[in-house]
Design a protein with these regions (language model features):
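Histidine-centered catalytic micro-motifs
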Residues: 44, 87-90, 95-105
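Short acidic/His/Gly/Ser-rich catalytic and metal-binding motifs that mark active-site loops
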Residues: 37, 109-110
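Conserved small/polar residues in nucleotide/adenosyl-binding loops
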Residues: 111-116
């Protein structure tokens, strides 16, 4: 899709910090880091979101997510990982090319409601 920023990243027209790449997916650091190491995993074929994907394409994407998430956790020293997929604007999707967010979580960034009140 000509005006899709993720398609342009996949085509090499826009630079990215690649984390993983194979024939089906590309994973790269999100330009708007929620936490250090925040990575996006995108299929190389353009789909608006998961709701538009066929079963095989969905399987190809999600089969790679755990391995990429483990590699990001190892590289960043994260204690955990949020794995998130938003579908449509009402659900928080802002780029309309299917993508999965890998947001590493760190114990040093934890706080409780008690700590927030101080």
């Amino acid at each position: 899709m000509a005006d899709c920023i993720f398609c342009k990243i996949i085509a090499g027209e826009i630079p990215s910090s690649k984390v993983y790449e194979d024939e089906k997916v590309l994973a790269f650091l999100d330009i708007s880091q929620v936490t250090p190491g925040h990575t996006l995993v995108v299929p190389k074929e353009h789909f608006r979101n998961v709701l538009d994907m066929d079963a095989d394409s969905t399987s190809q994407l999600f089969a790679r997510v755990p391995d990429i998430a483990r590699k990001v956790m190892k590289a960043t020293g994260a204690a955990g990982m949020n794995i998130i997929n938003n579908n449509e604007e009402i659900a928080g999707q802002t780029v309309f090319h299917t993508h999965v967010h890998l947001a590493p979580r760190y114990s040093c960034l934890l706080y409780t409601s008690d700590a927030a009140d101080e």
